[in-house]
Amino acid sequence: MARNDWINSYLEAILDVGTSKKKRFESNSKIVQKLGDINSKDHQEKVFGDMNGKDHQEKVFSPIKYFVEEVVNSFDESDLYKTWIKVIATRNTRERSNRLENICWRIWHLARKKKQIVWDDGVRLSKRRIEREQGRNDAEEDLLSELSEGEKDKNDGEKEKSEVVTTLEPPRDHMPRIRSEMQIWSEDDKSSRNLYIVLISMHGLVRGENMELGRDSDTGGQVKYVVELARALANTEGVHRVDLLTRQISSPEVDYSYGEPVEMLSCPPEGSDSCGSYIIRIPCGSRDKYIPKESLWPHIPEFVDGALNHIVSIARSLGEQVNGGKPIWPYVIHGHYADAGEVAAHLAGALNVPMVLTGHSLGRNKFEQLLQQGRITREDIDRTYKIMRRIEAEEQSLDAAEMVVTSTRQEIDAQWGLYDGFDIKLERKLRVRRRRGVSCLGRYMPRMVVIPPGMDFSYVLTQDSQEPDGDLKSLIGPDRNQIKKPVPPIWSEIMRFFSNPHKPTILALSRPDHKKNVTTLVKAFGECQPLRELANLVLILGNRDDIEEMPNSSSVVLMNVLKLIDQYDLYGQVAYPKHHKQSEVPDIYRLAAKTKGVFINPALVEPFGLTLIEAAAYGLPIVATRNGGPVDIVKALNNGLLVDPHDQQAISDALLKLVANKHLWAECRKNGLKNIHRFSWPEHCRNYLSHVEHCRNRHPTSSLDIMKVPEELTSDSLRDVDDISLRFSTEGDFTLNGELDAGTRQKKLVDAISQMNSMKGCSAAIYSPGRRQMLFVVAVDSYDDNGNIKANLNEIIKNMIKAADLTSGKGKIGFVLASGSSLQEVVDITQKNLINLEDFDAIVCNSGSEIYYPWRDMMVDADYETHVEYKWPGESIRSVILRLICTEPAAEDDITEYASSCSTRCYAISVKQGVKTRRVDDLRQRLRMRGLRCNIVYTHAATRLNVIPLCASRIQALRYLSIRWGIDMSKTVFFLGEKGDTDYEDLLGGLHKTIILKGVVGSDSEKLLRSEENFKREDAVPQESPNISYVKENGGSQEIMSTLEAYGIK
């Protein structure tokens, strides 16, 4: 019955909390009644605040929640049942008895609900494992079917070994062997490479000096990592410029420096042609508001367009400086975390350059951990952390990434292994096939490499590694007259907490987060009397002014720490300063080292553990969690002990062992200093650039060119200089690539020159795309219920062209038609409705997989086809997609190939109405599990599925044209309906202006976009954007013109 006594006491505590709250509220209400209008709800909320409101919940710790969680998590249903029986047997007419019975029922219900959540989660994980195994088996069968009999035998008999690339090995006397297929980066022969590298870290507060690490959950170790990486890469021979892109923040809540567009991180070395490294701040979202990372998702397209403008500008400028006028495109685009990974994926696709990803912290791993705890439902997890949106961003990043940089092997196996887009077994098989020169049948897996983060050793003084005796008496004595050296201010701030500051210091440095497990450390220290007698504890937990003003999660951790200090009476033994500068962190490490102390990282899970490396550099032995990256760090440095973060006794034993055993302490210090070079930034950069260069060998070189635009529009001209082809050909008339033979070339050249002279000054002249000042894009998905293009497209186009003529006049605005239909379908419908396609500068067809130019005899853009073909499975996708598209068996003619719309870059499938097909997110998931990377779009009112290359889409095609023609996306106007194909959301976000025409779309395909369990539209598209306007139903050219004028287009 002891367990039931605990339950009874918890229930009584809940009743007491509820009663006291009610009494306090009633008392306050009486006071207000005397003061004024108690019937005014607004007045009550003004005086008290909303008792159930979000702000109130963030500021006040809930005892009820604590006791309920204890009951639900600590006891089973039988205990709750016994308690309920007891309550029923002893109940009476008192209100408290009835409330107790009611609480029993409610908590019993919560316990059963938790049990159901755990059960559902187990079923979900089991189903997912089966699907992943099926995907891998399908891929292996397809791959095996293409091998010859001899190759099959060899494949069956060969025992494959793990080939995960790592640069983190146990200490050896010789250098680790470099694999033969990868050459180590040598600075001697790379000095003339002039590489341009782009790093992206979107969220948090990013600046080069006085970093506010720990200010909030978004400003942590990742900020320091990316800043130091940018500096280190810029100091590497062969690297010309490094840009670190982040979000511009002009909010009064933060320092003005976060609103500066450009910040130089490092100056180029003297006598060098290098440009150095810079922080580039890109505006996105509300510029005067600090937006946490969970709310940044709708603003990613805007960041992509802004970043693209910057990169194109820098590429052009660098090309003029050092490359004879030819643009220098980024050598690699590296995204950090899920949001920046998605940005990098879009940029890499638009520019056709390699992309690298570093996850830092992974959403799926966090999601599974939260579900296992059982304290919060799946819906609440997604509502709080936007976890489904984050996971999809990570999957998209895996699709596009050439390489994924990890800190440890554990991150590969236990974290990335949870994702649809990475299967370590399939990745090994594909790598073996590539080495043998055997086709992978369009399947692809990113390469995982382990490259530990580097450290900036510039703050480490020579004496930090030379002084074996760290006695504080050499610096501070009991009398101020004994001070021999200047004392760092942070030392005084810390030592004021201690009754004896000379004792060894146990140092913990992290943000106040539940995951960092600081409370367990305080408990371990408080309950170990020998440790308390021997050492002091220093807790550096970010910066704060008032605990009440901190985020809820941080304030709860700090309050718990303060309560534990009081509970164990640790006054004079624990320091917890309110403020510290980033520049003072080295002094904090020095203080611990000079007192012969220990650094501890007791986090529940630590992805890497950069602070452990920093501590080792200052000669501090370490105690670290055994979960995650510290395992590899301790293995490499051999300078400390690993512990179970849940075991208080193990933590106190490890700390006591290192502090009390002087010989062990000295040995750990010596080993750490000896092996720390393995984590230097130069070593990190050499390994990083070696792997990037290896990955670039299989990535096509970008041939993207930018049309040169004359400074002044001195005359009218043809559409494009390519239209007057000066290339010779042995073929007659036009060849397949648009070249002319000698005779035709001469005739066209003469005609063109004559036309230019005759049309000079004529108002009806047509400017080239490179001379357009704006672009108007018609992307209305107007279909009837049968998937046929509606005739109202004609009226939409005419209204748009007329409005353009009324605002800016002919020639200044170019027109683009973007559709999910094939070229032939577009031609048929426009001819039927007497639309002149030559009014358009480009036609984007088949959901963005093809671009045609009407003014060049409808010639296809072959460069764009090459631009998007990388990772395109081609013919290999046909049989797989036909197997996967239906949710249940279908008749043979229900799902058929739509041959007239198929092309080299688009596989079109016709879907009969009423057939149950998988949604886009489900299909994409199953293709990822099989190593196939594609973009999937339902169009024509969900009667057709277009399977196109990964980097192809309508929005990416328009970004491609924007780069080629030198027209910023901010100078582009999209005309859309209120709904459309499943890529409709992609067209809403970004720097471009959007005019939504009401009532023009009949049937759409968006019901097949994603399942109810996935993220919602508000997580992908800004709900209130100044760039989106509406034109009422049946609105004509005048209404469109008025909307354009509201955008400042006149």
Swiss-Prot record:
GO biological process per UniProt: sucrose biosynthetic process
SUPFAM superfamilies found in the cross-reference section: HAD-like, UDP-Glycosyltransferase/glycogen phosphorylase
Induction pattern: By cold (at protein level).
Function according to Swiss-Prot or TrEMBL: Plays a role in photosynthetic sucrose synthesis by catalyzing the rate-limiting step of sucrose biosynthesis from UDP-glucose and fructose- 6-phosphate. Involved in the regulation of carbon partitioning in the leaves of plants. May regulate the synthesis of sucrose and therefore play a major role as a limiting factor in the export of photoassimilates out of the leaf. Plays a role for sucrose availability that is essential for plant growth and fiber elongation.
Record gene name: SPS4
Activity: how regulated: Activity is regulated by phosphorylation and moderated by concentration of metabolites and light.
Class of enzymatic activity (EC top level): transferase
UniProt xrefs under InterPro entries: Glyco_trans_1 (IPR001296), HAD-like_sf (IPR036412), SPP-like_dom (IPR006380), SPS (IPR044161), SPS_C (IPR035659), SPS_pln (IPR012819), Sucrose_synth_GT-B1 (IPR000368)
GO molecular function, one term: sucrose-phosphate synthase activity
Subunit comment: Homodimer or homotetramer.
GO cellular component: cytosol
Species in which this protein is naturally found: Arabidopsis thaliana
Membership in a protein family: Belongs to the glycosyltransferase 1 family.
Protein name in UniProt: Sucrose-phosphate synthase 4
Keyword Transferase: yes
Keyword Metal-binding: no
Residue numbers of Phosphoserine PTMs: 148, 180
Region feature Disordered, mapped onto this chain: 134-167
Pfam families reported in the protein's UniProt record: Glycos_transf_1, GT-B_Sucrose_synth, S6PP
